[in-house]
Design a protein with these regions (language model features):
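Conserved catalytic loop/helix region of short-chain dehydrogenase/reductase
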Residues: 4-5
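NAD(P)-dependent short-chain dehydrogenase/reductase
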Residues: 9, 13, 17-82, 109-113
Length: 173
């Protein structure tokens, strides 16, 4: 398939088929905008960090008015552990992420630039084709299964993520 994100889509379909047609104790987690250290470069947060670190004049942000909620990896791992160790959770499909602190991509770019103490302008560009304008998961089912208080807000998680990328990636200054 040449459709962008087709392998991602097919893995979700396969996982749901396994979930529906097996007797295995399965929890189907739909992961939404998890971020943190070591996540590679093909996601918006590390990309904005890297491009901000390498820029002397400006940061270009695609889909500037599209909005997302982000969940720091430590919270995602803790939620997953709570679900896996809860014997009442079985044969469930649950969204995993955060529905707090919704932020536009342009504001995310400005926040990253601010946290990096860079004096560069943030410029909004065209929308990426196929990118949803808003991605905020419904966590109603998750909240009925477990009680979880998030430990990391967006700024705290970004500080940790930025620190890791600064120490572990080569970038020009």
């Amino acid at each position: 398939l040449n459709i962008k994100r087709s392998s991602y889509m097919l893995s979700k379909i396969y996982g749901e088929a396994l979930y529906n047609f097996s007797n295995l104790p399965i929890i189907n987690l739909r992961i939404h905008n998890i971020y943190g250290p070591r996540m590679g470069m093909s996601h918006v947060i590390p990309e904005l960090i890297f491009r901000s670190l390498n820029s002397k004049k400006y940061l270009e942000v695609y889909s500037p008015n599209h909005k997302r909620c982000f969940c720091f990896i430590h919270d995602a791992v803790n939620i997953t552990y709570k679900l896996l160790t809860n014997k009442k959770v079985n044969k469930d499909t649950l969204n995993l992420g955060s529905d707090k602190n919704e932020i536009s991509m342009i504001k995310l770019g400005k926040l990253i630039v601010k946290l990096l103490n860079k004096n560069i302008k943030v410029i909004g560009l065209k929308n990426n084709p196929g990118s949803p304008t808003r991605r905020v998961p419904s966590l109603k089912k998750l909240n009925k299964k477990i009680n979880y208080k998030y430990n990391y807000n967006l700024v705290d998680g970004l500080k940790i993520t930025i620190d890791w990328y600064k120490k572990n990636l080569s970038y020009k200054t």
